[in-house]
């Protein structure tokens, strides 16, 4: 079985503070895009191991890979003993703030759920995957969603209006734990002043996520642009001033706005036009390609379309 594992971007990311358990309380609006890895999974009765092939130098096919860990978690939870062969074809840049590894893990669990006829619901898979990482549950369904708690509690939102992003990934990564630590978010009281599992209707006013939820209700691309925000951007841009230059150039070449995705370092340029996206990408590639920066383009991808992709893959 072959499944596509799409990347995610953050349309809004607010860090509300540091909880007593050490995690940060966040409220985020996330969106999948049509930039995807491919995960091929097969049951192998000839051995009882997990065999992972593919990957990259930055994400090698070993026992520390999220795909391997996801497969092992499924086997332990479901009491399975037969072998699993997994091949991973990477397209999404690694350590880029795009959740490529998380999406690969989610695709692996979805494939094994189907292959072994486990009958797990999306919510059950999200709960299971939250044990591996905070952003993995969102990738089970994708589309446009609100993520709260430490990022593992997911609520679907109205789909974002269609748009394109130009992605510029520098030849360096950003450590998510280090970025969060450097942000210096205030300690939160215990118990929290609001529900840990916030819903769209209870998202704190004044946050980028609140503004984004309101913008999505209108279905207007311009309103979405105005609501974009990322609390982590200030940290990563301070460490790597070149990212500020990339943001300026993306808008200078034709994008409507630019924003860092997640903890970075990938910078996103937003446009409603595919032609503009391709034009900006060509200009950025000419400028930054020789310095080993990766330049990609992708459009928004809603859950229903992602499901159709994977139905086609399974035929």
Swiss-Prot record:
Gene3D superfamilies found in the cross-reference section: 3.30.230.10, GHMP kinase, C-terminal domain
Pathway: Isoprenoid biosynthesis; isopentenyl diphosphate biosynthesis via DXP pathway; isopentenyl diphosphate from 1-deoxy-D-xylulose 5-phosphate: step 3/6
Residues annotated as transmembrane: none
UniProt KW Kinase keyword: yes
Keywords from the named record: ATP-binding, Isoprene biosynthesis, Kinase, Nucleotide-binding, Transferase
GO biological process, one term: isopentenyl diphosphate biosynthetic process, methylerythritol 4-phosphate pathway
Record-linked Pfam families: GHMP_kinases_C, GHMP_kinases_N
Active site location: 8, 135
Signal peptide span: none
Molecular function, one GO term: 4-(cytidine 5'-diphospho)-2-C-methyl-D-erythritol kinase activity
Key word ATP-binding present: yes
Binding site for ATP: 93-103
Record-listed E.C. numbers: 2.7.1.148
Domain of life: Bacteria
Catalytic activity, as annotated: 4-CDP-2-C-methyl-D-erythritol + ATP = 4-CDP-2-C-methyl-D-erythritol 2-phosphate + ADP + H(+)
Record's function text: Catalyzes the phosphorylation of the position 2 hydroxy group of 4-diphosphocytidyl-2C-methyl-D-erythritol.
Similarity-based family: Belongs to the GHMP kinase family. IspE subfamily.
HAMAP family per the UniProt record, alphabetical: IspE (MF_00061)
Protein's name in the database: 4-diphosphocytidyl-2-C-methyl-D-erythritol kinase
Gene: ispE
């Amino acid at each position: 079985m072959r499944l596509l594992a799409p990347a995610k971007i953050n349309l809004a990311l607010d860090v509300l503070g540091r909880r007593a358990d050490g995690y940060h309380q966040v409220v985020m609006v996330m969106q999948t895009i049509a930039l995807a890895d491919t995960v091929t999974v097969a049951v192998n009765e000839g051995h009882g191991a997990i065999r992972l092939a593919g990957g990259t130098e930055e994400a090698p096919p070993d026992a520390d890979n999220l795909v391997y860990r996801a497969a092992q978690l499924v086997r332990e939870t479901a009491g399975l003993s037969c072998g699993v062969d997994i091949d991973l074809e990477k397209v999404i840049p690694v350590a880029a703030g795009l959740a490529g590894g998380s999406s690969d893990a989610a695709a692996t669990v979805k494939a094994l759920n189907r292959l072994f006829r486990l009958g797990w619901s999306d919510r059950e898979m999200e709960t299971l995957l939250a044990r591996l990482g905070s952003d993995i549950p969102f990738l089970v369904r994708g589309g446009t969603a609100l993520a709260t708690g430490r990022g593992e509690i997911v609520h679907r939102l109205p789909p974002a209006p269609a748009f394109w992003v130009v992605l510029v990934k520098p030849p360096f990564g950003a450590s998510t734990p280090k970025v969060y630590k450097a942000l210096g978010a205030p300690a939160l009281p215990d118990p929290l002043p609001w529900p840990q599992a916030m819903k769209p209707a209870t998202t704190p006013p004044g946050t980028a996520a609140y503004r984004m939820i309101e913008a999505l209700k209108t279905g207007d691309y311009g309103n979405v642009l105005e609501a974009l925000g990322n609390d982590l951007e200030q940290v990563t841009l301070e460490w790597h001033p070149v990212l500020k230059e990339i943001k300026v150039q993306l808008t200078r070449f034709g994008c409507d706005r630019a924003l860092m995705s997640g903890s970075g370092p990938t910078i996103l340029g937003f446009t409603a036009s595919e032609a503009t996206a391709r034009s900006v990408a060509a200009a950025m590639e000419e400028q930054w390609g020789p310095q080993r920066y990766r330049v990609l383009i992708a459009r928004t991808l809603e859950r229903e379309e992602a499901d159709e992709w994977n139905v086609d893959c399974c035929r």
